[in-house]
Swiss-Prot record:
Keyword line: Hydrolase
Protein name as annotated: Putative agmatine deiminase
Gene name tied to this protein: aguA
Listed SUPFAM superfamilies: Pentein
GO biological process terms, semicolon-separated: putrescine biosynthetic process
Enzyme class of the recorded protein, top EC level: hydrolase
């Protein structure tokens, strides 16, 4: 049994620190990506091309889809033939830590499709549960086996200086680690991520089927500086959730004792929902969560990804699209802030941050 990453001197860098590259997975699951994923593949391509301007992109794609992926992307990415059950690289990929000497360590969490038999979204997740270790092996990185502790990358944010953000709704959900107390979960995070403090936000985004991942509601944009998904509509269930998160953040400090600067990032003004036209496009496996017309999707501009040269921000053909771009442009003056039409990723159940996983420099 190897010592914990914390004891070995490793920590999780912030996403805005320099990257070696980004991990992504080609979207092919018929129950996630409607109509053969055609629209999703166009969106993924735009994201990959934008990220690739400033860093390497590793794309997991099985042999059967390789020529298709190459027809979209050519030689812009490093293709790896690693099997997956879906395309959520944030949640199935490794969390890569660094130490003071620049050495890297890949943390391999247990993955059970956001809740296993309790409330998981699909039951065939064996390949997904192996993605982190197989990808680390391909990169020739050592692996810290955190199993059987269940965690997804979208459930944690790090400031790179000892602070981890999580949501109670996700980490304390009965489908993750029901046998562990909150204190035990926190201790596992501190030891596995080389951190000093965990901040527990009460909620994420309303109707987020990951049990409300933190990466959809709050994100670090710098040390002691965050953006928070927000609405002023008191009739929207999101209002009370964001308000509770705001109140907690206002009284909290980071691991260094600093109070947070909090930027409110509006959610889209018009609710994003599944339409009747979307439904025929999905083909489900047994035991897979099914979409319904009128289902509210967890749309949030906070699900952006910070690449070396760009910040990629979801866009929903909404009046708040530009508002979000303007706020984030002020937060990231040294990067190009790029809006990406993202409804076709949202239809899969996540957004830009959910399909990317940074590999620190």
């Amino acid at each position: 049994m190897m010592d914990s990453p914390k004891k070995l001197g490793y920590h999780m860098p912030a996403e805005y620190e320099p990257h070696h590259g980004t991990l992504m997975i080609w979207p092919t699951r018929p129950g996630s990506w409607p109509f053969q994923g055609k629209a999703a593949k166009r969106a993924f391509t735009q994201i990959i091309e934008t990220i690739a301007e400033g860093e390497r992109v590793y794309l997991l794609v099985e042999q059967a889809y390789l020529s298709e992926a190459q027809s979209y992307l050519g030689d812009k990415v490093v293709y790896l033939d690693i099997p997956t059950n879906d395309a959520w690289a944030r949640d199935t990929g490794p969390t890569i830590l660094v130490n003071d000497k620049g050495k890297k360590l890949a943390v391999d969490w247990a993955f059970n499709a956001w809740g296993g038999t309790y409330d998981g979204l699909y039951q065939d997740y064996e390949e997904d549960d192996q993605v982190a270790s197989r990808f680390a092996e391909a990169l020739e990185r050592p692996v810290y086996d955190a199993k059987p502790f269940v965690l997804e990358g979208g459930a944690i944010h790090s400031d790179g200086q000892g602070t981890i953000l999580v949501t109670e709704s996700c980490l304390l959900s009965p489908g993750r680690n029901p046998n562990l107390t909150k204190e035990e979960i926190e201790n596992t995070l501190l030891e596995s991520l080389g951190a000093e403090k965990v901040i527990w936000l009460p909620y994420g985004i309303y109707q987020d089927e990951t049990n409300e991942h933190v990466d959809n509601v709050v994100a670090f944009v710098g040390p002691a500086e965050v953006v928070l998904a927000w609405t002023d509509d008191e009739n929207d269930p999101q209002y009370a959730m964001s308000k509770a998160d705001l109140e907690l953040l206002e009284q909290e400090t980071d691991a260094k004792g600093c109070h947070f600067t909090i930027h409110k990032l509006p959610i889209p003004a018009v609710r994003q929902v599944v339409t009747e036209e979307d439904l025929p496009g999905y083909i489900y496996e047994e035991g897979e969560e099914e979409r319904y017309a009128g289902e509210r999707l967890a749309a949030s501009y906070v699900n952006f990804y910070i690449a070396n040269k760009a910040v990629l921000v979801p866009q929903f053909e909404d009046v708040n699209d530009q508002v979000a771009l303007d706020i984030l442009s002020k937060c990231f003056p040294d990067r190009k802030v790029v809006g990406i039409p993202a409804r076709d990723i949202l239809l899969g159940g996540g957004n830009i941050h959910c399909i990317t996983q940074q590999i620190p420099e």
